[in-house]
Every structure is written in C-alpha cells, then in structure tokens.
Amino acid sequence: DIGTTKIVAMVGEKNQFNKIKVLGVGKSQSLGVHRGVVNNITQTIQSIKIAIDEAQAKSRIEIKDVAVGIAGQHIRSLQHSDYITRENPDEVINNDDIDKLIDQVYKLVMLPGEEIIHVLPQDFKVDGQSEIKEPIGMYGSRLEANFHIVVGQVSSIRNIGKCIKSSGLQMGDITLEPLASSDAVLSFEEKDAGVALIDIGGGTTDVAIFKDGIIKHTA
C-alpha cells in the first residue's frame, strides 16, 4: 500500500475458511508520494524497502512478489456497454465467452497517456433479456454487458512499477485501493443492500459505491 503519508507491506496466507491470516506487517514513512502519485522515485524506493524489510522480519518469510494498491488523482472511472455475437449459440454460455467480452473492452482506446486498470462487469443481457447477474449456463447468441471501467495514467503506473522493481520485487496484480478495501471490510449483504465505502487517506479520499452486489461507482 503506497500512500501519501505511509507505506505498508503485509504478508498473509489463506486459512481453511478462505480468510487471510496476517503473518507480518511493515510500515514506513512515505516521503516520495503526493496525493497518491509518486513524485520522488529514490525516496519511494527507500520507503518501500524499509516496509518490506520489517514485514519480512516479522513474518520470517522472504518477499519476492507483491500485489500493489493504486489510487490518486490520476484515477478516473467510466461506464461502458459492449457485446459479442457468440460463434456457437447451440452451446451454453461459459467463462470463455465472458472473458472474450472483457478482453474486447480492455482493447478500448482511452485518452492519450491512459490505460485501463480494471474492467468490472455489472450486469449482463442475453438476446435482449436484461438484468442478468450470472449468464453462465444460459443459451443465447448475443451476449451484452454493462461495465465499470477504471482508468489510470500510464506514467503513474509505470513509476510505481519502477519503484517496486528497484526495491528487488516483482509486481503482480494492481488493484484500485477502494476495491481492495471493500473486499476486506464489506460483507455480501452490505454490498447487496447498498453501501458507500469511504477510504480517507493522508493525501486522497477514495469512494466505492455498491448496490445489488454490483460496483456502481468509484472516485
């Protein structure tokens, strides 16, 4: 978690209940980040190393690969609808069909200097039948979906990647921080009923809004 005021590294493992057991946490003062954006590579690398070293010492586990949270003023979101025409409508819709549709959305052209971070399906439509949450197993030739798309500046994402790599680590998944926070603190019932998660940080405040178990808005 590369924040404006502090950098936090956490080591955890899944237990038999599919919950994360925290094995070690490291923290350091963040000196090279402003409003969620890296503005000093050298200072950020130093802060990352301090947090990682502390997390390794407490967990007694060597850290090589990390998942990174991303936020900041360069992040924006938008709504988009798209569809595919299935090649085999006599077969039921499967994960490959959904992946094909999502991959198609990832190819959308954003503004210069931007790239897509997340493509999040909200609901589906099969041959005109709308408001479908789970289309897998259904028959249909035209598969449509509404998407919530999260976009960030390429330069900001690359700067984070450089800091991670220069700290001797490999960067895995990048996740929008309010989405990661929502998975950690919100229940399915809360997301289904409707809830707004507000993450107040040292330099930015992030929001994620859910309704009917679907991500509706991020900011």
Regions inferred by a protein language model and the residue ranges of each:
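Nucleotide/phosphate-binding catalytic cleft detector across ATP-hydrolyzing
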Residues: 2-6, 10-198, 214-218
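A structural feature that tracks compact, well-ordered secondary-structure segments
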Residues: 206-208
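A cytosolic small-molecule/anion-sensing beta-strand core signal
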Residues: 211
